[in-house]
Amino acid sequence: MDPDSFSIDVAGRGQTTALVYRAKDPMGATFLLAHGAGAGQTHPFMVDISRRLAAAGVDVITFNFLYTERGKKMPDRVDDLEACWRAAIASVRARGGPTPARLFCGGKSMGGRIVSQVAASNAFPGAGLVFLGYPLHPAGKPKVRRDEHLPAIDVPMLFVQGARDSLGTAEELSKVASKLPRAAVVPIEGADHSFAVLKRSGGLTQEEATQRVVAAVASFIRAGLSTKRTK
């Protein structure tokens, strides 16, 4: 089934499109997912992950950042990216969407980094954050870190990270997460920043790697819902 769509008004900046992948057997949670710097919400990875999570019981909503919606390759300024994330959250909630206890947000690479900055600077109206390939540092520049703001986030965080990610390996992320009170890292053996695995590595197949990504996210969201219900 094709996803539904709706428009998001990013006040004073323009409009963008969101896609809704409805869960077949809903667990009662919504995952708002942003794309990375190099590809929009219709990239095969985004579509595949969204469909698989919907099959696992999670309602998934993706959206384009404004530069992607306009057909541009260069990402917007950080304040515009953050404004788009805030508008997406507000739009989902205004449409009669989930309460904060049932809303999870995250993104692939840059999309995740931007929502982490939003969550660190404001009271975050959600139950948790999911990062698919968090860009801890630029490729080849491990000392240029992007983790200074993470301790300010007060909701549970899940980092799903490839063991070969050139923007921060799972091992590097584990060291960061060990200093955060509510963070967990799920390493994907043999995977790079795009969660692609080497065909002749003798480790996980591509399908197995993708399944582990989806299972990690679904389990994190399910656990987050259970925690809220027991309080």
Each predicted region: which residue ranges?
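The conserved beta1-alpha1 loop
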Residues: L32-G36, G133, Q161
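Catalytic active-site module of serine/aspartate enzymes centered on a nucleophile-bearing elbow/loop
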Residues: K199-K231
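Short beta-strand/loop motif that positions the catalytic acidic residue
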Residues: A152-D154, F159-Q161, D165
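Serine-hydrolase catalytic machinery in alpha/beta-hydrolase-like enzymes
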Residues: S5-R102, D192-G202
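Catalytic histidine neighborhood in serine/cysteine hydrolases
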Residues: K179-K199
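Primarily recognizes the serine-hydrolase "nucleophile elbow" in alpha/beta-hydrolase
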Residues: W85-V155
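Short gly/ser/thr-rich secondary-structure transition/capping motifs
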Residues: A11-Q15, H137-V144, L167
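Conserved alpha/beta-hydrolase "acid-adjacent" motif
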Residues: S166-E172
